[in-house]
């Protein structure tokens, strides 16, 4: 690490004193400043783009150039004649320029392609080759080079601190805009331009009457120059310990038709589509009633299967097959598109977990988990846009899965005695757990936008969800659990306990919006809508005896048959107006609620009306700087899962009993957001603060006995608050970039444990700083450090965990075709008294692609230092937890890739 810092310091020192500044003002013939003019410097001998800049709102530009080197300077702006001249300087130079308008506008497409950055209204266009260093393999690598663009830990693209709404390719949806599929599968060589579309909306009629500051999309323009073309790659690999990789990717694009095929079969830990991604994948369906003041959480993934930690496990086998298409007719008036995704993952998870319970017991478990997850997603979309006044769209999304998880678990319980630790456990239980579910859903959506005239706009949207979940749970164990609840037959060799569940959900949402344009800077919005939910919940617990017969328990508290109905009819009004630098949008919503749940012969009815104000203030300090405030109040309702009165297994040592008398909770949220995106000097600043408070909270009431708990839900007037703050600064220089970010998350809440009130706090702090080189003709290195502190306070127990993580990343293009990349991180994980674990990650790849050749040869090594385990910690109202899980060992993979662009059509 010290050597890396020393090398980086020498590079910065050497380059700082071997460069000079070329700066000045750019104006038109009338003396007006020209904002957004491109200034580029090309080395005359090598023809390499060595520097570029953009004039700011004062017309000022600055370039850092090498001393005594011959450059060709080009200054251009759309609608003006280009200024081209040669330059060679040995000291700082300041010079102003006047651009003349030309009779005919320059070809905008040509300018966008040649210039590194072009700004057109809310759109920023980056020329990928101007930022690439030569080591890029996929779209994610290209995007990471761009200022203000990040790829987060989940593989989702963030621009200007916000998750993007979608990614399109040549204006066509790529798997409905899913950024993870696009960034991991589009070859970097095919990327020509990246268009960042700010204030994005798919309904053009609503652009000037709705708030879209949080909506950002990315469009990828491909390198081709042809009306019809194929591209893609075939990738294969083999390694030690029977490691294999096969990944074909084929793409076809034409003006009126496009299609893509993605395949992947690997056991080297490369993610394709995880079970978590499956539930996240919305297929482009938006939260229809996000602003109506009502939230009802329709639970999914009810089986409670485990998720991978950062795509790490002892073994990961993954398969993916995906097809995407789009077809248009009559100059894009009518379009149909869709996709099919089939994925399967087979994971082996081996982990050790230590839980410190508030009851004073410590539980150590050793888990061996085998997961088999199969997912299918199908999407069909058709849209009809005959003119700029009418837009109609229909969407259909079908999802299904088959998930099976087998766990062999050993649980040892100890009394907490730091001064005199107990060697022998007070209880040991061998448990085999089977969890299985086959969820499915059909989601339909209809959207219609109609502009009657310049003052009247109508919007109608409706969604219908039909969902079925059937989680099954089985635990075979040595020790009888929950003796006071389940009347098990004790004259058996083991206790074989089973539970069936079936949850059917039917949800309809619809709303009609009317926008009345008062002036070019103000409008009224009237909305009427409805949310209607119907659910049926069935469950039963039974025991399988040694002779394979079933012992069914007929007690009401061990079975469920619940019907739940919920309806919200609402009217909302918002007044949006612009005055000076402010965009104001006060409003209110009137909701009429009615809910009913029927179980055990009893009917629980609840109905009431609520008026909820909301306020949004947007302050535009500059074109690139803004401050935003949002206030919302939301009624939060639970679904049938929290209302069912019969007992439900959460896991082997936890029962849950619903409460049919639960009422809605009130959620108040205050958000303040600041951002400054300076495209002229590539400095970005983001800050966010969020405060939330709940009243009549739905919270836990728990009976804890040893390591076993029975939890129920109640409404409580006890305060529940949370604070979240984050900030990020990143700065890009000519050959360097630096960044710093931090976030704080504090929550204070109350629970009732064994009849006693327990006030609990959680406070998490994260800091990350990095500095990196950004050369086109030299190796690049990034050095950084992250620090994480987590504190958990349950009143009687306090736990503190710390993780220090320095990291180094290297990528180098050299030798006319060689690319070397390496990624190293060291993690020092500890609590206040001892080191809990130290682990490192080191991955390295070396590839060779001869210029002009379609073949690429590569060798990659995963987990080069052969570390064996990784730690994570977490906290809830009953215990704090430290988890250590086994990761894949070191292995080497030899790869061969063929570029399918060689079979491109005409």
Regions found by a protein language model. Give the residues of each.
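Membrane-proximal, glycine/serine-rich, low-complexity loop/turn segments characteristic
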Residues: 19, 25, 31, 60, ...
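Short, ordered, surface-exposed loop/turn motifs in non-cytosolic proteins
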Residues: 30-44
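A short, solvent-exposed loop/turn motif at the edges and junctions
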Residues: 42-48, 70-85
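Short, acidic Ser/Thr/Gly-rich low-complexity loop/linker segments typical of extracellular
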Residues: 45-60
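Outer membrane beta-barrel strand-and-loop segments of large Gram-negative receptors
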Residues: 366, 507-509, 553-559, 657, ...
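Outer-membrane beta-barrel transmembrane domain signature of Gram-negative proteins
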Residues: 497-585, 597-602, 618-622, 717-728, ...
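Conserved C-terminal beta-signal and adjacent last beta-strands/turns
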Residues: 768-787, 799-906
């Amino acid at each position: 690490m010290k050597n890396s810092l020393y090398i980086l310091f020498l590079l910065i020192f050497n380059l700082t004193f071997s460069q000079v500044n070329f700066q000045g003002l750019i104006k038109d013939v009338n003396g007006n400043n020209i904002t957004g003019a491109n200034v580029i410097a090309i080395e005359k001998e090598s023809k390499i783009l060595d520097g570029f800049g953009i004039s700011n709102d004062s017309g000022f530009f600055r370039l850092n150039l090498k001393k005594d080197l011959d450059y060709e300077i080009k200054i251009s702006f759309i609608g003006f004649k280009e200024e081209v001249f040669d330059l060679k300087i040995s000291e700082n130079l300041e010079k102003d320029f006047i651009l003349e308008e030309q009779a005919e506008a320059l070809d905008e497409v040509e300018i966008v392609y040649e210039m590194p950055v072009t700004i057109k209204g809310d759109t920023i266009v980056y020329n990928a080759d101007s930022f690439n260093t030569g080591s890029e393999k996929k779209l994610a690598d290209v995007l990471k080079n761009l200022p203000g663009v990040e790829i987060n830990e989940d593989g989702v693209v963030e621009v200007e601190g916000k998750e993007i709404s979608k990614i399109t390719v040549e204006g066509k949806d790529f798997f409905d805009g899913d950024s993870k599929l696009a960034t991991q599968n589009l070859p970097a060589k095919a990327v020509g331009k990246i268009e960042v579309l700010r204030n994005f909306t798919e309904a053009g009629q609503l652009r000037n009457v709705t708030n879209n500051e949080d909506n950002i999309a990315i469009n990828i323009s491909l390198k081709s120059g042809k009306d019809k073309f194929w591209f893609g790659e075939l990738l294969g690999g083999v390694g030690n310990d029977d490691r294999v990789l096969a990944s074909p990717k084929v793409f076809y694009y034409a003006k009126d038709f496009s299609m893509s095929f993605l395949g992947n079969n690997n056991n080297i830990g490369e993610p394709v589509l995880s079970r978590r991604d499956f539930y996240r994948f919305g297929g482009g369906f938006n939260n229809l009633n996000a602003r109506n003041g009502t939230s009802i959480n329709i639970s999914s993934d009810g089986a409670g299967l485990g998720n991978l930690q950062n795509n790490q496990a002892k073994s990961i086998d993954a398969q993916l097959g995906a097809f995407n298409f789009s077809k248009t007719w009559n100059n894009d008036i009518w379009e149909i598109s869709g996709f099919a995704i089939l994925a399967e993952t087979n994971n082996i998870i081996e982990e050790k977990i230590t839980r410190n319970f508030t009851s004073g017991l410590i539980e150590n478990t050793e888990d061996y988990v085998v997961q088999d997850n199969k997912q299918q997603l199908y999407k069909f979309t058709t849209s009809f846009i005959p003119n700029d006044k009418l837009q109609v769209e229909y969407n259909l999304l079908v999802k299904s899965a088959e998930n099976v998880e087998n766990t062999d678990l050993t649980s040892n319980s100890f009394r907490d005695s730091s001064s005199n630790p107990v060697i022998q456990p007070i209880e040991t239980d061998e448990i085999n757990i089977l969890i299985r579910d086959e969820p499915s859903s059909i989601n339909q959506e209809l959207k219609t936008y109609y502009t009657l005239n310049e003052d009247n706009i109508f919007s109608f949207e409706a969604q219908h969800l039909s969902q079925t979940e059937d989680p099954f749970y089985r635990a075979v164990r040595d020790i009888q659990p929950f003796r006071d609840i389940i009347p098990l037959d004790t004259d058996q060799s083991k206790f074989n306990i089973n539970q069936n569940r079936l949850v059917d959900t039917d949800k309809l949402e619809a709303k009609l919006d009317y926008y009345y344009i008062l002036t070019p800077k103000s409008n009224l919005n009237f909305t009427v809508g409805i949310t209607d939910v119907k659910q049926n919940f069935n469950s039963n617990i039974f025991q399988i005896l040694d002779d394979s017969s079933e012992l069914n328990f007929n007690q009401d508290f061990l079975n469920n048959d619940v019907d739940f109905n919920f309806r919200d009819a609402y009217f909302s009004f918002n007044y949006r107006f612009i005055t000076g630098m402010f965009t104001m949008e006060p409003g209110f919503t009137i909701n009429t609620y009615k809910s009913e749940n029927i179980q055990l012969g009893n009917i629980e009815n609840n109905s009431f009306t609520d008026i909820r104000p909301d306020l949004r203030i947007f302050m535009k300090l500059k074109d690139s700087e803004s401050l935003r405030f949002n206030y919302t109040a939301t009624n939060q309702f639970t679904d049938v899962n929290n209302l069912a009165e019969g007992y439900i297994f959460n896991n082997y040592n936890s029962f849950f009993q619903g409460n049919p008398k639960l009422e809605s909770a009130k959620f108040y949220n205050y958000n303040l957001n600041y951002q400054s995106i300076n495209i002229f000097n590539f400095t970005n600043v983001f800050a966010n603060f969020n405060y939330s408070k709940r009243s009549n909270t739905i919270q836990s009431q728990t009976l804890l006995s040893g390591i076993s708990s029975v939890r129920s839900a109640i409404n409580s007037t006890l305060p529940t608050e949370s604070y979240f703050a984050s900030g990020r600064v990143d700065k890009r220089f000519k050959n360097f970039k630096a960044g710093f970010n931090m976030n704080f998350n504090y929550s204070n809440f109350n629970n009732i444990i064994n009849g006693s009130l327990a006030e609990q706090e959680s406070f998490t702090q994260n800091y990350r700083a990095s500095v990196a080189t950004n050369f086109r003709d030299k190796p690049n290195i990034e050095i950084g450090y992250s620090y994480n502190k987590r504190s958990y306070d349950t009143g009687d127990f306090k736990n503190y965990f710390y993780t220090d993580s320095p990291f180094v990343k290297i990528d180098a293009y050299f030798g006319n075709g060689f690319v070397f990349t390496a990624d190293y991180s060291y993690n020092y994980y500890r609590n206040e008294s001892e080191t809990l674990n130290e682990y490192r990650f080191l991955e390295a790849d070396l590839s060779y692609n001869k210029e002009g050749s379609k073949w690429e040869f590569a060798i990659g090594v995963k987990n080069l230092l052969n570390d064996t385990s990784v730690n994570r910690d977490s906290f809830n109202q009953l215990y704090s937890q430290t988890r250590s899980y086994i990761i894949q060992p070191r292995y080497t993979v030899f790869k061969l890739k063929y570029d399918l662009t060689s079979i491109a059509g005409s």
